Amino acid sequence: MKKWQLVGTTVLGASVLLGACGGGDSSGSGSGDGKDLKGEAKGEGSSTVAPIVEKLNEKWAKDHPNATISSGQAGTGAGFEKFIAGETDFSQASRPIKDEEKQKLEDKDIKYKEFKIAQDGVTVAVNKDNDFVKELSKDQLKKIYNGEAKTWKDVNSSWPDKKIKAFSPNSSHGTYDFFEEEVMDKEDIKAEKNGDTNVIVQSVEKNKEGIGYFGYNFYEQNKDKLKEVKIKDDKGKTTEPTKKTIKDGSYALSRPLFLYVKEKSLKDNDVMREFIKFTLEDKGKSAEDAGYVASPEKTYKDELKDLKKYDKKSDK
């Protein structure tokens, strides 16, 4: 059985070696069939997307013992920084690439391809003993996270006059960017921030007046310790995050999850190209195994069709 191995830790997060053990120079060779495939593809980015990549790799490594996928989970922003710097073949992202990131890639003449590999719902949760917060509107969430609401009573006059303890990912995370865009209208988030999502979960669990937000699978893994909060959308409809509401988009904080891959790596690195093909042919099963939601089947079909142009056989 393959094991995930910690190969390096930075102030941004842990880098995890996925798949077969062994070296590699971020290049790949071989026919693309199982044991003939040799080399490595390197990635970095979202801790939300990381569990999906790990699940994919558990399957991949069984038939590709000499093809290594190495990836970290330092956050979407940190992942794009390495992607732009030329240090990685792919970047995991829990938000779309920003215009300024696109420009930096364009300035370096780095072309890339976007793949939507799954769907997620950013989940808001409070302490398990909180018996009064059952739902929140986006406006109420904004008041909590911009510091306007200091106590629960400031959010709802019928709630206790107790100081709120708000927790958030830090700005290196795509979940932070998504929340800032969808909830905060780009206002600054005023909360205790952490780069480790597990620490945020633990903080909400330990603080009776705690509130936090994170990817759906982090809630799913800890739902015996936390209480989810239903979200009221702009039309006044209240919905809880479930696989169904995330898939049909009725949950107000639904979002796609991405892999961004350099076109050069798709053309020149057999390991990278075959892993992306493997990911799309998996049709979101690994995403479901990781606690997320598969993209519509048409998404995978269309992306597989687009991927064919990078196949070396198609150049002959």
UniProtKB/Swiss-Prot annotation:
Keyword Magnesium set for record: no
Family label: Belongs to the PstS family.
Name assigned to this protein: Phosphate-binding protein PstS
Chain residues carrying a lipid of type N-palmitoyl cysteine: C21
Region described as Disordered: spans on this chain: 23-49
NCBIfam families, sorted: ptsS_2
Subcellular location as annotated: Cell membrane
